[in-house]
């Protein structure tokens, strides 16, 4: 009996269902510790909190693993190796986009401040000292686990499900948007979207998730190092004897000072713009000199690629939009989710 090969539209629909289920699963994992029970964790050390964060990230990959097992996809395809030069270039890109990301976050923080919003401060344990163990736990959660999990799900399974159904440019945009909205942070929307699009481009162009993993690791590690330095400098400048602590989870949200528009513009022109140009040059070179991946462009006729295939994607975006709206309502004080 000949093996039945599913239509590309069926693969697209199945991947949309994965996106929907993963969104619900991820929200269930992070909603309670982020909003509803934030004060319940005040007795835990930053080390424990970052280990909890790493555990949640590992749990979030379960839907993708089950999806791969049920659909009998080969991990050797999803985890296809990349050339060493591609991985190195990916890491370099991840480093270059950090100043651009910070500048976008500054501009966004300025916009939120000018429109009456307030940046949410993450819950911080009151007494523990910033130790090597805490930094190591943060590194494990942010620089190792998060890039591996997110790249496998987004740039591996979800992006691959769009091959043969959508043009490459549309697939890059769709995956980048989904990645951004799953973070659920309005203040970081422009910077996360920029990073998500760059990561997706690297995966599509190289045909492997490893350049995007390298970029993701370099990006997160750079932000972590900057935050540790900022904590140390702030501690030295403060007259209080208590040591600084690392906010769990470590994010740029809540650490970005409000700037006026002129200051934000200066930051962009003097710091971020040269890095943005450099990033563009590196990405152009990556595109120009990387071997083509054989991305499956859509065929002329795709049976069943209408609403039956697209509704899971629409549902996933609706769920994530509601999740993002929760953050907006919190930012502007319309509702109070974090208890005082």
Could you describe each region identified by the protein language model?
Residues 2-25, 48-51, 73-105, 296-321:
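Interfacial transmembrane-helix boundary/kink motif in multi-pass membrane proteins
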Residues 25-34, 60-64, 97-105, 223, ...:
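Alpha-helical transmembrane segments of multipass membrane proteins
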Residues 133-339:
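Transmembrane helix-loop-helix hairpins at the membrane interface
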